[in-house]
Design a protein with these regions (language model features):
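Hydrophobic beta-strand segments within beta-rich accessory/binding domains
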Residues: 89-90, 100-121, 158-164, 208-229, ...
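Gram-positive cell-envelope targeting signals
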Residues: 1-33
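Non-catalytic extracellular/lumenal accessory regions of secreted precursors
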Residues: 28-109, 137, 143, 178-216, ...
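Edge beta-strands of jelly-roll/beta-sandwich modules across compartments, strongly enriched
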Residues: 123-125, 162-181, 231-233, 259-261, ...
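Exposed aromatic-hydrophobic patches
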Residues: 146-152, 258-264, 369-375
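A glycine-anchored, Pro-Gly-centered beta-turn/N-cap motif
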Residues: 154-156, 267-269, 377-381
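Solvent-exposed serine/threonine-rich low-complexity stretches and specific carbohydrate-binding patches
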Residues: 134-144, 246-256, 360-369
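Short, surface-exposed beta-strand/strand-loop-strand elements in extracellular ectodomains
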Residues: 123-135, 230-242, 348-359
């Protein structure tokens, strides 16, 4: 009896470490950043003629508020078209740190100022962002000669000065600059095409997303520093329960190879990502939900039937036990070749699959998963899928033929 049963049973462990492609949505999960969208600025692009010494008080610019990568993309295109920028043209006094303009910052965040200068006819003079009216009171900032990056800036009025004083009077100075402030506001909602850009203050950053139906949340969280380096972030996911946030997943961290996407099985509800970065760094939050809410059986007796050429998608939640099982069945109406395809809905998924029935089937690797196949006799075949690890996200089981 035992020998006959083993002939009719297939038990395999399927590892879906390669499954990231099933949840990615093209360009919006590509690693984009502020630096990758910056245009080239030149001091001469809008210069028409020499002017008398200008008043920097007349050269004022409101920094554009940036909440998403789309916001910055739009602003960058305007800069490229010489819009949303200011131009200073004038002459220095002797030994003067020339003030070339005023920047008004309306919200707290990281300030990004692309600029270009021409001093005494030579390109490349550096600017610095200071508290208004005092060139000696410089904000903490990174400056590469083309862009100023200042973190944890409070809303207020600031000024741009030449970093080096002009020794001679009547030195011609030209400066072109734009200004953006990436918001440090917490508790915004991200998802779909809404890629949040959030300036870190050094404390924990919280950004929210929603899951409408039980499924797989494909989340990408990464950060960018003042030098333009992009890297991974270790973060946790919390679910709102009543008025309390409860942690449901910790130690999550994506890799550059898969554009920092990590998949997590979650029930319907409101969630937030908790991430940390150094002050001034920009955190990016991307979320793509893949629904996986088809019904499943909780026991062999309650197995849900999958019709021929149909499939079911389901997910093991991140906080479910590794002993959790889902049951399905197919009905083979006549003897012949039968194919059952099982694919993952997330990276690093691991499940075990047991198939029992009138014939023992084989298995082989297919794109993004495994195929269970063979000449099946007429009858009912049961498919038991068991959660294999805490990292399990989701799967699809299809009665292909």
């Amino acid at each position: 009896m035992v020998k006959n049963f083993l002939k009719r049973t297939l038990c395999i462990v399927l590892s879906f470490a390669m499954m990231t492609g099933t949840v990615m949505v093209g360009a919006k999960t590509k690693t984009e950043s502020i630096h990758s969208k910056l245009p080239a600025i030149t001091a001469s692009q809008r210069v028409r003629a020499k002017q008398a010494k200008a008043s920097a008080a007349a050269v004022q610019l409101n920094a554009t508020n940036v909440y998403t990568l789309s916001d910055f993309d739009t602003l960058s295109n305007k800069w490229q078209a010489n819009q949303e920028m200011m131009l200073y043209q004038g002459y220095s006094d002797a030994n003067e740190y020339v003030k070339v303009g005023i920047v008004r910052v309306g919200i707290d965040g990281t300030v990004v100022i692309p600029y270009a200068t021409k001093v005494a006819g030579v390109d490349g003079g550096r600017l610095k962002l200071c508290y208004n009216g005092n060139p000696a009171m410089t904000l903490s900032q990174t400056n590469n000669g083309k862009m100023i990056w200042a973190g944890a800036v409070k809303a207020g009025t600031y000024a741009l000065y030449l970093e080096t004083a002009c020794e001679n009077a009547n030195t011609p100075v030209v400066a072109a600059f734009g200004a953006a402030v990436i918001s440090s506001q917490n508790n915004r909602t991200f998802g779909g095409n809404n890629v949040i850009a959030s300036a870190s203050t050094g404390a924990a950053t919280y950004q929210q997303f929603k899951v409408s139906k039980r499924g797989v949340a494909a989340i990408a969280v990464y950060k960018e520093n003042a030098a333009g380096n992009v890297s991974s972030v270790t973060y946790s996911v919390q679910k709102l329960s009543g008025k309390t946030w409860k942690t449901v997943a910790t130690g999550l961290s994506g890799t550059a190879k898969n554009n920092y996407v990590v998949t997590t099985g979650l029930a319907a509800g409101t969630y937030r990502v908790v991430a940390n970065a150094a002050s001034g760094e920009i955190l990016y939050f991307i979320n793509v939900n893949q629904k996986a809410s088809d019904s499943y059986g909780t026991s062999k007796k309650k197995a849900k039937e999958i019709k021929r050429k149909k499939s079911k998608k389901q997910v093991f939640l991140s906080n479910e036990s590794t002993s959790k099982t889902h049951w399905y069945k197919i009905k083979v109406k006549k003897t012949g070749m039968t194919y059952i395809d099982i694919t993952g809905l997330g990276n690093k998924s691991k499940i075990s699959v047991t198939v029992t029935g009138a014939a023992r089937l084989k298995n082989k690797t297919i794109s993004k998963g495994f195929r269970i196949y063979g000449k099946a006799k007429k009858g009912t075949y049961y498919i038991k899928i068991k959660k294999g690890s805490k990292g399990t996200s989701g799967y699809q089981v299809k009665y292909t033929k």
